[in-house]
């Protein structure tokens, strides 16, 4: 059960959206060419394409989700492609408020760079989350879903979900891209997917939960439920949302859920320069602090195995990650995507990259979890792209549920738990 189900009494699914934004390190503002590892097409579901109207993307996304999640009724629009605060405030308002006008959408997740926010934009997002922007906006969880004004108008059957193709084992909550892989990605040659997602069905399915409350957010109560192995994820909840700060059935919210998710990628400035990010870690710290100060749910994304970073460096950066006022963190292993500058760099010097095998990666992830703050929600521990975008699949034919079972067993074998080695 998910973080949102615990808070709102039902599962809430993400819909990946493309609003046509760009990045300042692509257009010459702070650099050219973008991040050296990035090909955004590798992270797009089929329904989310630039130039398509947002409401059309939402409708197609709901239909896309329908088979897998037939009981889901509410969605978060996930602005994922490129930097989704890189534009004028007026442009941002148009995009966000169009998305929030859909009767089955209950909130917004904004993926962006730390150098693409300012006080004005964050104040607007704070007003959006605080109910000061969309007057009369309402959504009802767990009840009939019918309310006045902006409220939900569809029946329970109409707002549901499914993933297709290779994404059959994935949750859109993971938010990392290619959950809309084409049928041709499922060919015999391509079935060696080299990566996985820890999604909203993660360790809670196998855990005995004990609940711990965190109150870092000024506008919400965040309750962690720790499994027997101690992973703090956003996928653990009560059944009806009425306990631990969740909402009872039929409860109405008068303001949308707003989450800001920063691509930080590394805590090392030398790495950020090497991959052409165009900002330093101090910029990321300032952005996270400015966002959290406004009571906004704040998340971050990190890549494990960027060139020049050793295993020891990646473990050492856990202290820096824990020092940030984050609610959630996503990790994924570096994947060498075809046609990127990173592909050329890897071909020239593979020894500069830490690319562990699957067995070593499990222990590595556990070592990271043990060093992180115990109240951080871990939304993802690995990532995946369609096989057609990569040349190698070093982990072979391994699916998500298998990886999750492996990770859970390994943590139990080691007696590991998130935060065990964390020291304030």
Over which residues does each language-model region extend?
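Long, intrinsically disordered low-complexity tandem-repeat segments
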Residues: 146-213, 217-244
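Radical SAM/AdoMet-radical enzyme domain recognition
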Residues: 107-110, 118-144, 149, 153, ...
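Conserved C-terminal portion of the radical SAM core fold
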Residues: 136-142, 153, 282-342, 359-382
């Amino acid at each position: 059960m998910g973080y949102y189900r615990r808070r709102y009494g039902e599962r809430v699914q993400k819909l990946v959206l493309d609003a046509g934004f760009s990045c300042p390190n692509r257009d010459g503002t702070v650099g050219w060419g973008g991040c050296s590892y990035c090909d955004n097409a590798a992270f797009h579901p089929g329904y989310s394409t630039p130039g398509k109207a947002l409401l059309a993307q939402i409708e197609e996304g709901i239909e896309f989700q329908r088979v897998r999640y037939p009981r889901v009724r509410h969605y978060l629009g996930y602005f994922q492609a490129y930097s989704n605060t890189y534009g004028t405030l007026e442009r941002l308002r148009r995009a966000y408020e169009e998305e929030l006008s859909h009767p089955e959408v209950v909130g917004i997740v904004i993926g962006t760079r730390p150098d693409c926010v300012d006080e004005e934009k964050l104040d607007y997002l704070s007003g959006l989350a605080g109910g000061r922007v969309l007057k009369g906006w309402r959504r009802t969880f767990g009840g009939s879903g019918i309310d006045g004004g902006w409220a939900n108008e569809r029946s329970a059957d109409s707002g549901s979900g499914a993933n297709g193709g290779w994404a059959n084992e994935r949750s859109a909550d993971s938010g990392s891209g290619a959950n809309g892989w084409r049928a041709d990605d499922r060919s015999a040659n391509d079935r060696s997917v080299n990566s996985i997602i820890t999604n909203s069905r993660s360790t809670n399915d196998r855990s005995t939960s004990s609940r711990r409350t965190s109150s870092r957010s000024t506008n919400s109560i965040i309750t962690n439920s720790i499994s027997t192995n101690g992973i703090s994820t956003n996928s653990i909840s009560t059944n009806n949302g009425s306990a631990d700060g969740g909402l009872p059935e039929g409860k109405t919210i008068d303001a949308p859920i707003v989450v800001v998710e920063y691509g930080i990628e590394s805590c090392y400035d030398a790495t950020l320069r090497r991959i052409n990010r165009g900002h330093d870690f101090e910029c990321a710290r300032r952005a996270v602090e400015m966002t959290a100060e406004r009571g906004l749910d704040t998340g971050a994304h990190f890549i494990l195995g960027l060139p020049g970073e050793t295993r020891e460096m990646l473990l050492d950066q856990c202290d820096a990650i824990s020092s940030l006022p984050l609610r959630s963190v996503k990790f994924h292993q570096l994947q060498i995507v075809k046609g990127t500058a990173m592909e050329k760099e890897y071909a020239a010097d593979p020894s500069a990259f830490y690319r562990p095998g699957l067995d070593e990666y499990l222990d590595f992830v556990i070592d990271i979890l043990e060093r992180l703050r115990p109240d951080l929600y871990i939304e993802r521990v690995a990532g995946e792209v369609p096989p057609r975008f990569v040349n190698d699949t070093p982990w072979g034919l391994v699916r998500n549920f298998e990886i999750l079972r492996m990770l859970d067993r390994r943590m139990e074998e080691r007696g590991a738990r998130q935060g065990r080695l964390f020291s304030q």
